[in-house]
Amino acid sequence: MYGITTKNITNANGIKILKGEKVQCLFVTDLGSNKYEGLFVTETGVKFLSDFSNVLFNIKR
């Protein structure tokens, strides 16, 4: 899935991912209680973990 970040995010290595960057979701983890976390990667290869409130997806069927 591809999406766009909805706010600035800092990953675990201190690298800032800016609002509006295009990202791809590589992996989804079920945290329970209807909550999920994803491993995302930017177009420049920066990886970060985030819940899905920080990324907007345009999913088409």
What label would you give each PLM region?
Residues N11, V28, S50-F52:
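Short, structured coil/loop segments at alpha-helix boundaries
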Residues S33-L39:
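Short aromatic-glycine-enriched beta-strand elements
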Residues I17-V28:
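Conserved beta-strand/loop element in small beta-rich adapter and peptidoglycan-binding domains
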Residues A12-K16:
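Short, surface-exposed secondary-structure edge patches
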Residues L39-R61:
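Intrinsically disordered, low-complexity, charged/polar segments
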Residues M1-I9, T29-S33, I59-K60:
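SH3-family beta-barrel domains
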Residues Y2, Q24, E37, K47-S50:
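Intrinsic disorder/low-complexity segments
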